[in-house]
Amino acid sequence: ISIIMFIYLVAALFNLRIPDTGARYPEQKINPVQLTKDFFVGFHILWRDRLGQISLAVTTLFWGAGATLQFIVLKWAETALNMNLSQGAILQAVSAIGVAGGAVWAASRIPLKSALKVLPYGVVMGLLVCIMAIYHIEYLPSFALFTVGGFVVNFNLLPAYLLLIAVGWLAGYFVVPMNALLQHRGHVLLSAGHSIAVQNFNENLSVLMMLMLYALLIWLDVPVPIVITGFGLTVAVTMWLVIKKHQANQAEYDSLHLIGEAKH
């Protein structure tokens, strides 16, 4: 907890150094009814925008899937890798390393104009998750490869680490450009605050719904491999549908030139 508090403190200090952008907004209403009305106006604007709906759909799926995957990894570690809870938490950290790497790679390689080119990576990520369902620690011999800070990396766990790094990398690689595009469209069509409010509402609703579904499957004692396969296929199929929707939008009207336009 102390480490987390320290990180938040450092983040707050960084925020203090952010320069004033000069943006000034009119005084906001405090009437709850009017605020709710304004929120849903922004909600519909962003979902109806051809670029906004694609990026919002992807980020919404990502946060819901990401939160659920954290719990799936723990269950997978218990049933397939013979790990306890603390050992399973290490797998979550391994996945986070992949996400960070993919995010940095995307930031250095994908310009805003090319953001939508990363959509197929979401399909690949979903299919890669399905591979988790077929791997078990007993498939390979167990012997120590190397030690990192007192943590022993065994040979039969190496595929699990590599798989989670790959899944995390793909997730970070496709969500960063989508988030950048969403922030851009939100800035153009609404405002930074209204856009973030709509984004957070959708993302948290996605987290809630997907975790409820996962909890139901666990309560029904559905085998973990089936849960993992269903989860991976859901992500892959949803991303495929998003791609088809984008292609249909482009067939009707080329909206890519809107990327980079000034605020209305």
Question: Whereabouts are the PLM-identified features?
Answer:
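A single, central transmembrane helix in multi-pass transporters
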Residues: 1-2, 44-101, 119, 124, ...
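Juxtamembrane intracellular "pre-TM" segments in multi-pass secondary transporters
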Residues: 20-56, 80, 145-154
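Structural signature of the two symmetry-related core transmembrane helices
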Residues: 117-132, 229-232
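C-terminal ends and interior cores of transmembrane alpha-helices
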Residues: 124-153
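Hydrophobic alpha-helical transmembrane segments
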Residues: 1-24, 93, 97-98, 125, ...
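Helix-to-loop junctions at the C-terminal end of transmembrane segments
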Residues: 101-116, 217-218
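Substrate-agnostic recognition of the 12-TM MFS/MFS-like secondary transporter fold
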Residues: 1, 5-8, 54, 62-70, ...
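Helix-loop junctions on the cytosolic side of multi-pass membrane transporters
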Residues: 4-30, 112-113, 136-140, 243-254
